[in-house]
Curated annotation (Swiss-Prot):
The lineage of its organism: Eukaryota, Viridiplantae, Streptophyta, Embryophyta, Tracheophyta. The active site is at E134, D274, E367, E388. GO terms for molecular function: alpha-mannosidase activity; calcium ion binding; mannosyl-oligosaccharide 1,2-alpha-mannosidase activity. One of its GO terms (cellular component) is endoplasmic reticulum membrane. It is found in: Endoplasmic reticulum membrane. This is Alpha-mannosidase I MNS5. Glycans are attached at N89, N107, N121, N201, N349, N494. It comes from Arabidopsis thaliana.
């Protein structure tokens, strides 16, 4: 920087120049730490990926202890695999799942090699019975995400020619899903044979997640191909599922797709239901359809009312709202990340700290933890390298920039390397009390666990453009052309949609910088980011005659009540 030598300006110029050289020591330390941890996560990913490619590819997943493979996509639905072709080698699920992670790590060479191999070798014309939900989030989602990354010129991932090969594979797979939706209710079967459709005497039982978490992938497929059947089928199923909710706006865990009757009445944010909530919100962000927001808002309020107990979330009967099971499940650890997206930062932080406390207690997160007894569930002591806690840690750091979350990520990286890393990859933990290992490296370890830990320490990928991540961690870029109704204000880091009534102003959390009641724009302080659970009092002066005129608090998500002197507030203790 050159300065004009002028007596009156010399001092000011020196001050300006010095600002370019003064560095906050704590900030510098954080950046050094982030860089070091990023490289450690990179090493983790490639240790898992290279061993898969060496010992398991093109089969589905790696067995790291024996350095062999499992064709898990088919084995999920086939206890006996005699009917499979003798030359069946799986569907390269781990490769499909790894493509978006390779893109985020900037490995264009390996990304292009993977795309080329899949284009020339992958086929779904196989006599294999697969789980619709798992195949959708892992394979269909992986192909769609990789296709979108491949055609984005900013990524420069493909040096040769790319002619939508991954999209054609995704379209073929999507068409093979459609027979599953041919039920009296429109709710899809949980299992589908990729070659022959729904098998005779197929089970009619499925989960809420299984039929309510398909709309992101199938909706994106319709937008990309112009074929409306995929999104229509997924949306019809989702709406039917929502019509089956109780008067409390709660849904059970399992149901019958033919009769439309509930089988398991226990409702929760955990296994069997978790991604239902996630996809309602993310579908609203991705497609802008108001129905998604209305469903999510009602479901979210109900979850806060009937499941929340301090920082924990127990299960409750969908009809009565009374608690059923007081247990933490590892899949629930996604919830703080979802709360970040709707702006409930305080609640997200509170729950996240409790999950991490359990992680610290055992070294990893057990599958089920009994809250009332503070012990591990006797038959569910395993940890299959799940990503949900890493995912929420990433979101909370993005929202707060609190370096404590970097410490959490560092602790997780150390634990994974200490307890689960073996010469042949990363192994699941069979029993967290003994750290006995299991011979399985799930594909989601590369698709999600490593990805979210990497993004925690290096967010340059999400800083460039708006993405939502599917429940399997596959990024899909948010583009205005996919919105039914464009936001009134659109800009690169976020978007705002102004409305009338109780929802006077709201912002989706695409920039991951959302907190309740923080001004969107310093020039327009009346525009504020509200949490999803925030419902305004009917009167602007907060006066009331009854509880019906009071709303829901934005920070705690608690119902406000009318006091004896006629004002709405948080008068009742927890």
């Amino acid at each position: 920087m050159s300065c004009p030598i002028h007596p009156r300006r010399l001092f000011l110029c020196l001050l300006i120049s010095l600002t370019f050289f003064v560095v906050d020591p704590s900030s510098q330390h954080i950046e050094v730490k982030k860089k070091q941890m990023r490289e450690k996560v990179r090493e983790m990913f490639y240790h898992a990926y290279d061993n898969y490619m060496t010992y398991a590819f093109p089969h589905d997943e790696l067995k790291p202890l024996t350095k062999s493979f499992t064709d898990s996509l088919s084995e999920l639905g086939n206890l006996k695999l005699e009917h499979l072709p003798t030359d069946y080698n799986g569907s390269a699920v781990t490769l499909v799942e790894s493509l978006s992670s390779l893109a985020i790590l900037g490995n264009s060479t390996e990304f292009e090699k993977g795309v080329l191999w899949l284009s020339e070798n992958l086929t779904f014309d196989i006599d294999a019975r697969v789980n619709l939900f798992e195949c959708n989030i892992r394979v269909l989602g992986g192909l769609i995400s990789a296709h979108l990354l491949a055609i984005d010129p900013n990524n420069r991932l493909i040096q040769g020619s790319y002619n939508n090969q991954l999209l054609r594979l995704a379209e073929d797979l999507g068409k093979r899903f459609l027979p599953a939706f041919e039920t009296p209710t429109g709710l899809p079967y949980a299992w589908i044979n990729l070659k022959n459709g729904v098998m005779e005497n197929e089970t009619t039982e499925t989960s809420t997640s299984g039929c309510g978490s398909l709309v992101l992938e199938m909706g994106a497929l319709s937008r990309l191909t112009g074929d409306p059947r995929f999104e229509s089928a997924a949306l019809r199923a989702l709406r039917q599922l929502w019509r089956m909710r109780s008067s409390l706006d709660l849904l059970g865990t399992t149901l019958d797709v033919v009769t439309g009757e509930w089988i398991e009445y226990s409702s929760s944010i955990g296994a069997g239901v978790d991604s239902f909530y996630e996809y309602l919100l993310k579908a609203y962000i991705l497609f802008g359809k108001e129905d998604y927001w209305r469903m999510f808002h009602s479901a979210y309020l109900a979850s806060q009312k009937y499941f929340r107990h301090g920082p924990w979330y127990h299960e409750a009967n969908m009809w009565s709202g009374k608690p059923t099971y007081w247990q933490l499940t590892s899949l629930q650890a996604f919830w703080p990340g979802l709360q970040v997206l709707v702006g409930d930062i305080a609640a997200a932080n509170s729950s996240h700290r409790e999950f991490f406390h359990v992680w610290e207690k055992f070294g990893v997160l057990p599958e089920r933890y009994l809250l009332d007894h503070q012990i591990i569930h006797p038959t569910m002591k395993y940890y299959p390298l799940r990503p949900e806690l890493a995912e929420s840690t990433f979101y909370l750091y993005q929202a707060t920039k609190d370096p404590w979350y970097l410490d959490v990520g560092e602790s997780m990286v150390k634990s994974l390397n200490l307890y689960t890393k073996v010469p042949g990859g990363f192994a699941s933990v069979r029993d967290v009390t003994t750290m006995q290992l299991e011979d399985h490296q799930h594909s989601f370890f590369l698709a999600e666990t490593c990805k979210y830990l990497y993004l925690l320490f290096d967010d340059s990928f999400v800083a460039k453009r708006n993405y939502i991540f599917t429940t399997e961690g596959h990024p899909i870029q948010v583009v205005s052309s996919w919105h039914e109704k464009l936001p009134e204000t659109y800009f690169s880091g976020n978007w705002t949609l102004s409305k009338s009534g109780a929802w006077e102003s709201r912002a989706s959390a695409l920039s991951l910088q959302v907190c309740p009641l923080i001004s969107l724009n310093s020039r327009h302080p009346e525009q504020q980011r509200e949490s999803a659970c925030h419902v305004l009092d009917e009167q602007i002066n907060h006066k009331c005659w009854s509880n019906k005129e009071c709303g829901v608090d934005a920070t705690t998500c608690r119902l406000r009540t009318c006091s004896g002197v006629g004002y709405c507030g948080l008068w009742n203790p927890l």
